[in-house]
């Protein structure tokens, strides 16, 4: 008997009809001879609606109370799914994150999972019940306060539970039926991938793919939890994410896909002193504010005045905070200026085959040249090339790269209505 963990996103649970459909799928999995644990996101746009409601009563709500509010969304869908399962004649028991043993750091709004002790879930499974766990949430062991795991936290909850329960597979259901070679909404002939290594999925998640959040893939790789990305709208087997890139024979290594990211902004510090430790001050201040930095470029030092310019990207959502921090440092460091640009996007090419194909970088640049796309920043890894470009050029760049590396097929991809979650 296999143990299957299934996670359903908000689009899969957005209405009573969708919840009943999900319940039927869950019960069918149980009847096939599996033990089943289900992790639920909040219904549809519930989380966004709760955020708007909070802002209406308090523009700067206390972080603890915000977590108390937001976790209600998952508890609602949790209970409704359990009710729907019971209506089909199967036994179900719902759990909050804390009841399921999800222990976290105490940082409200973006806590990290430190341990999972799913004793009550194991007991319910032993009794033959289907277990329904609220995603996106946990509890801090010291304060006993409810915490949330940040956007995409339900994915991480599902993978963490799968690891703690030694599940055979963790299935992530949304409104897309797998991982594609590109966003089908941008590249119509994008093709679904049957299998990816953890490293390839990590790179895709890190550079913009919204199918899985980065933290969930990191957790899956660390504990070797096989992931399967599937659609709740079809019975397609989806995409399997398992194994290491090192296990792929060199002859079989391929270019995986093109990822796009519309969430970054570019910040440039002009006229900073080109001395040891000056750049460190910039990035330490941002790190202390928990602002993630992605691409970084430092220009050649000016011989005349011993200064340089530093350009980097950060999440657009953190842009205002980053600028406030840097404007204060500008006065102290006597910098020339700090510039902010949110009219930029990022496009990336990912694939294990990049290691064994020396001409990939040249072809990448030539493909963008041919559609008149200018490159502002470049970053690379062993299996990835990313560039920052003007936001108006993103779609053309993605299509050009997809065509250049022959990643498409003859048929157009099937796109279900929804957001990819």
Swiss-Prot record:
GO terms for molecular function: aspartate kinase activity; ATP binding. Gene3D superfamilies: 3.30.70.260, Acetylglutamate kinase-like. ATP binds at residues 7-10, 41, 174-175, 180-185, 210. It holds the Pfam family ACT_9. GO terms for biological process: diaminopimelate biosynthetic process; homoserine biosynthetic process; lysine biosynthetic process via diaminopimelate; threonine biosynthetic process. It is an enzyme of class 2 (transferase). Low feedback inhibition by lysine and threonine. The decreased sensitivity of C.flavum, as compared to C.glutamicum, is probably due to the Asp-345-Gly sequence difference. Pathway: Amino-acid biosynthesis; L-lysine biosynthesis via DAP pathway; (S)-tetrahydrodipicolinate from L-aspartate: step 1/4; Amino-acid biosynthesis; L-methionine biosynthesis via de novo pathway; L-homoserine from L-aspartate: step 1/3; Amino-acid biosynthesis; L-threonine biosynthesis; L-threonine from L-aspartate: step 1/5. The record marks 7, 74 as: Contribution to the catalysis. The keyword Disulfide bond does not apply. It catalyses: L-aspartate + ATP = 4-phospho-L-aspartate + ADP. PANTHER family: ASPARTATE KINASE (PTHR21499), ASPARTOKINASE (PTHR21499:SF3). Catalyzes the phosphorylation of the beta-carboxyl group of aspartic acid with ATP to yield 4-phospho-L-aspartate, which is involved in the branched biosynthetic pathway leading to the biosynthesis of amino acids lysine, threonine, isoleucine and methionine. This is Aspartokinase. It comes from Corynebacterium flavescens. The gene is lysC.
